[in-house]
Amino acid sequence: MKRDEFDHVLRAAAHALGQRDFLVIGTAALLGSYPEESLPERATRSREADLAPFDDPDGDKSMLLEGALDLGSQFEKTFTYYADGVDFRSGVAPYGWRNRLVKYRSPASEPGVGWCLEPYDLAATKICVGRAKDFEFVGALLDAGVIGKSNLMARISLMPKDRITPAQIDRAIRWLDGRQPR
């Protein structure tokens, strides 16, 4: 996703739900910390922004967002990118992630504001979940020097052990230890 697309999605989400603040948990969260020009192509090729509306105890707002801006919506058909309304109550991130959120706001996103996962929290979450595309994404960030191995290892150690299994953490660490720098 490009910055102008991210701005548009935040603006559209804010108008669709009548609220301004959204947690950004997917790859688009990087746009809160870095200009797209400084990111590897793999980090900006997604067409979606994963947005979790704040103050959504029952997940109803996430469902409304899904209908208005998700894959297959008129919004996506018109613009080719979209917002995936997510409910982060079941999500997982390293301890302390809420204190490290990166606020993203621009004149083009108004009235929408994105509270983006910090890049190391995002990367740790992705490689502990461990899908092939997540390893590819994190590998691209490491190869481009956007994130560093030692800081990522430290963040992996903060993953909640009651939500991520020891096997998932071990797999992430083995993958990170076995990577050959490019």
How would you label these PLM feature ranges?
Residues 1-182:
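Compositionally biased terminal segments of proteins
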